[in-house]
Design a protein with these regions (language model features):
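Flexible, small-residue-rich helix->loop connector segments that border functional cores
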Residues: 29, 283-286, 315
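Exposed beta-strand face motif in extracellular beta-rich ectodomains
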Residues: 311-313
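Serine-dependent protease modules
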Residues: 2-254, 259-262, 267-271, 297-301, ...
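Conserved PDZ fold ligand-binding element
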Residues: 71-75, 275-296
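Secondary-structure boundary/capping motif
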Residues: 290, 316-317
Length: 317
């Protein structure tokens, strides 16, 4: 199943949203997309500083991306290193145990799967997040503050693009949409939709105590991952074989100032790696992979998602 702008899943809801007459865009999008958004509950175990274990529980949202039971959500919702069980709650209240197939902390994305047998699962229709502009309508659907408020819709606009945020653990996320559609705890992993009810992002975070500032991961980032998982049951990431530091960080920390403002400064090339075979050397600065501009380790990783093992790619240094 190739993931295009148009739905490829036979059960994907490709209804055209028409807000003529008394129907609002929000109402039309709700009718089209709401049944594709699910609630997620997790049970896990955490340890305190004295190594005492206690049971934890978590809540979040997810989006059905295939009628075969594949669901896209955030890594921090279902993090396999912290959870022992994951349960999906469909829009009609049906509960199903889910298995985590893939997750990535840096991207804050995860793919889980439920058994589709006997279920009428409606997959979302995918939009093209590269076509999203500031000022476009943005509609978030998820479960803010828990399952009691499941299938909640909030509406706003795309307020910004290519946003970089720093998370509580000090890690950064890049290339995000900013929206004023309300995103609250529990909304994580839910969908951000355009005015046609097409999925354009996965909601991930809100800015501290600020109202009206939420962030969403553009859906195009997840498409190559979903494509591989739905076809092969797993995602094999491409490894370049370099250890590097963001140029922006190097320019702050380093003894010398580099001749460019952004990119990845190669600290070490792993022997026998694809980078080694291609002739990359220590002190090279990677600025482009294929058609994708590289400004940091995070954007380098994102650029490599579009390639499979064995593909040839041009790297600019």
């Amino acid at each position: 199943s190739t993931l295009n702008q148009s739905p490829t899943d036979k059960n994907a809801n490709s209804t055209t949203v028409n807000n003529s007459g008394s129907t609002t865009v929000e109402k039309a999008v709700a009718e089209k997309a709401m049944s594709s958004v699910v609630g997620i509950t997790t049970v896990g175990v955490s340890e305190d500083m004295f190594s005492n274990q206690k049971q934890t529980s978590g809540l979040g949202s997810g989006v059905i991306v295939s009628s075969e039971g594949y669901i896209l959500t955030n890594n921090h919702v279902v993090d396999p290193s912290k959870t022992t069980s994951v349960t999906v709650i469909l829009s009609d209240g049906t509960k199903k145990e889910a298995k985590v197939l893939w997750s990535d902390k840096t991207l804050d994305l995860a793919v889980i799967k439920i058994d589709p047998k006997g279920l009428d699962l409606k997959a979302v229709e995918f939009g093209d997040s590269s076509q999203v502009s500031i000022g476009d309508k943005a509609i978030a659907i998820g479960n803010p503050l828990g399952i009691n408020l499941k299938s909640t819709l909030t509406s706003g606009y795309i307020s910004g693009k290519d946003r970089v945020i720093t998370l509580q653990d000090g890690s950064t996320m890049e290339g995000l949409f900013q929206t004023d559609a309300a995103i609250n705890p529990g909304n994580s992993g839910g969908g951000l939709f355009n005015d046609q009810g097409q999925l354009i992002g996965i909601n991930t975070a809100k800015a501290g105590n600020s109202d009206g500032i939420g962030f969403s991961i553009p859906i195009n980032l997840a498409k190559p991952i979903l494509e591989q998982i739905i076809q092969n049951g797993k995602f094999e990431s491409v490894v370049l074989g370099v250890q590097g530091i963001d140029v922006t960080k190097y320019n702050v920390l380093g003894q010398e100032k580099l001749p460019v403002d952004s990119g990845v400064y190669v600290h070490e090339v792993l022997s026998g790696s694809p980078a080694d075979k291609a002739g990359l050397k220590s002190k090279d600065i990677i600025t482009k992979v294929g058609d994708s501009k590289v400004t940091s380790n995070s954007t380098l990783k994102t650029a490599l998602l579009n390639y499979k093992i064995g593909d040839k790619v041009k790297i600019e240094v």
